[in-house]
Amino acid sequence: MTILNARNLSLEEVHRLFGFQKQYNDSFSNYLSLQPLTEAEQQELKQIQDDFDRYLTAGKVSEGQVKFLAVAPLLRLAGFYRYPIEIVLEENIADIEVEDEDIKIKGRFDILAISKAKHTKPQTYFWVLLIESKNSQIDISTGLPQLLTYAYKNLDNQKSVWGLTTNGRSYQFVYIEEGNPPIYYLLPELNLMERERSSHLLQVLKAICQL
């Protein structure tokens, strides 16, 4: 049996191994109810932008810094630190076996938000949002194969999963849906450093947190 690491898979390989089909959706409102931000939220968002921009100006922002300076503050502001949400960091996924090709895939996700108030199966919590982060100089699309691989395993437990791949500046949300074949929808790319799209980013995170 061939053992692969999800980090090394290409998007083409993920499509072939799991049968994923890619589609595009140009509106978050097809999935989420987006609410206006308060003045306090807008001010905190501006502070996150300013903090991250200082590091961007200095040069490359590492993956760890992206998580600490951008992702973590955004999740806190969106409500992900409050019950019933629980944040899980850098845990190994259960091995994924592709029997037709005699392949076993291993991997470790970056950040997973689960709901402690919802079970999909006994001892299995509902996945609210799966996040894959990269350093600021890497295109966000490079995180998509890992994201889809980790989400695919959980489609046995729930009908759909929200995913997000980010380099701190750009944010690509993905709506992943079970089916034969499974489908993932790419939503419009958002950007922390642009006023309108950063507000939209926080609105989306808040809406996902309420699922």
Where are these regions (language model features)?
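A short, conserved, highly charged catalytic patch centered on acidic carboxylates
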Residues: 2-3, 11-160, 176-211
